[in-house]
Amino acid sequence: MSRPIFKVHKGDRITFQQRLQDGYVCLDQFIPLLTNLSSFNFHRDDPLVENLDDMVTSQFNILIDTDRSGTRWITLQKAHELWDLLQIKDDSGSENLTDHDDDNEANHNGVEDDGQKTPENNGRKTDNHTMENGGTENTNNGNNSSNKNDGNVTAEGSNFRPATITNGTTSRISGGEPDTVKHELLDLPDSPTKRHQTKSVSKIPVFQHDLPTVSTLQKTLPPVSNYSNDERAKLETLLQRILFPETTNLNVAEGYPSVSLTQQVQELDTQFPNVPLNFNIPIDEHGNTSLHWLCSIANLDLLKQLIVFGSDRRIGDKSGESVLVKSVKSVNNYDSGTFEILLDYLYPCIVMVDDMDRTVLHHIVITSGMPGCNAAAKYYLDILMGWIVKKQSRTKESHCVLLEDIDLQWVITHLLNARDSNGDTCLNIAARLGNVAIVEALLDYGADPNIANNSGLCPVDFGAGTQPRFQSNTKNLMATPTKTHETSLDPMAESTSLITNIKSLLSKISNDYGDEIKQHNGKMKELLDTLNIKREALANARDRLAKAKQIQDEYNLLSDRLNNVENTIAEEDQNFQLASRELGLSLDDVQEEGLNSADIAFDADEPFRISYVYTKFEEKIKDEYNNDFELFLKHCNLSQLVHEIYDNFPSRAEIPHPKILKARIKAYNRNELHLDSTLQTIIPHPKILKARIKAYNRNELHLDSTLQTIKDKQKNLESKFRKVLSLCLKIDEEKVDSMLDGLLQAISNEDPEDIDTDEVNNFLESAAE
């Protein structure tokens, strides 16, 4: 959103566009005029000149801010310089919304007479979110009255403005009329500073309970950790009552409920007797205290009361961020215009740094890089520097050493060029973010663009401070030990210095890169060695795994074979029992014959075995050949062994005559007598012999039947094969048998792929004929 500014140049009326959000002026109307004024002898439409605009802006040292639509904008300060250079005057016949006509500006944008925008028609969308707490919607922009002196604040009857740097010197404000300066904090016609001017109290309140002992940069105090649950419960109950009271009475000045903290504390003392009220207890997981939250939401009324009740302003959160840092990380104080009054109560936090050694200026610059926070950050920066200047006329009766020490000289010496843990100054961060307005403001306030961070990068490397008006500062700023650098206005000297700086920077980067490459190569070598070792170990592990899998497979195979053998043995035993029953060797038959089950131990060779001879053979193999039957067959003389056994056979007198033996067997069968011991050792029991004979007969019948079945199957199969061949060869079945030998010879070969098909075909053709 922009508004017109009407100007007159050589009798012609020119309309310039000014952006409402930050007061920047569109550059497009300046380019033709500056081209005519420049030293370039080219026509604007000359095809040889493609970058004429860049050449013009470079000649006149113009920093450009390009928005998303491609429109180029410059600061209002630079626009005034160009208007003066081009001798462009205001159009007296129109209403210009410039810094010389604030009343018309207010009427044009829906601003009330007191300088504040009405909530119904405020002319802009407020981005009221915080960086940490998510933010809340705020419909009140505050109604603190503002002066109508074009941003000049009256102090002791005289107008004064914040100190700025002009032509290398510092204009210090000490109560008198200031020198003419180019960068003014409160003179932008539509700046947040003018929209949100607030009335500061004439005297800065001083609370001695938490003032820093020295006026040098120091760390914030860590969050309180030694507290009881009752203390925390009491504080949370109090915050619930004061932030969300049951009554609906609002503080008209700030838009928050008006609550008496003293009354609430008295009521809580009756509810929590003997429990002290500690306002410094953290109330969230980030270590934020009540002051942190109140600063973030811009609730000044409760903030003042908490400080009166003894809240410590030096305590930071878990990151070391002070309550003042929380206030600049939110846009609520910008929307309500309460930041200047807030500084009257939080000035001890100006000397505080967080765990990364970052000051409040660092955080203001970082906030400027957040979406929708650029204008708020610029407002915080201008108000802070303006407060530093104006407080010099307000601290005469305060009798506070800290307030007396914190002046503009102290800010430039200790705060403006302070470096964080990375070596970055606030100007270095702003230059990297590319925030032109913040960079120019910091340079005007006296920031040094040549201070390098830990990586060797300076703000100058990002284009900050390269304009001649910043390079002409060759003296110490305000007689302080702040480091300055002489810069010649000679373009050749400037180019030589810039080339030297670039060479040194490239050399340092090259050295750092070489060191990093060496370290990287060393680490890579170590990693490769480790990788090779791991690869060998992996290969060995894979080999072991393969062997283990092979052994496991073999084990599984052997287990399967063993199971198969056992199953086969069990099956054969079962079949043997069935066959034994069929052959008359079952246990039932033995029991019918009056024998025990041990008597039916089956031995197929037993009917053909002579126990005496068999015993002699066993003794011979065992005693002389150590049970090695192959060795026995190789070295033993069987004929000699047979003669020995025959010679040593028991005497024939011990064996009865065959007739006598038959008579005894008959008598034995009639149970008339028992066989003597000699016959019992030679001839089995007659019943066993009968059972065996019966079994052999049955077995022979079974074998004959099986043989006949096989023969029948074979004949049937041969008949089928003969029929198949006859059909294939197209001959009679009777001729197949006579042709089998020739056909077999034709197709027989070791390799089936090398079968001589021609020979087979010839044979088949001859057979068909």
From Swiss-Prot:
Keyword match Zinc: no
ANK repeats mapped onto the chain: 286-315, 422-451
Biased composition (Basic and acidic residues): 110-130
Annotated spans, Disordered: 94-202
Repeat found in the keyword field: yes
Keyword line: Activator, ANK repeat, DNA-binding, Repeat, Transcription, Transcription regulation
Pfam families membership: Ank, Swi6_N
PANTHER family documented for this protein: ASPARAGINASE, CHROMO DOMAIN-CONTAINING PROTEIN
Biological function: Part of a complex involved in cell-cycle-dependent transcription. SWI4 and SWI6 are required for formation of the cell-cycle box factor-DNA complex. The repeated element in the upstream region of HO (5'-CACGAAAA-3') is called the cell cycle box (CCB).
Quaternary structure note: MBF contains SWI6 and MBP1; SBF contains SWI6 and SWI4.
Designated name of the protein: Regulatory protein SWI6
Gene name as annotated: SWI6
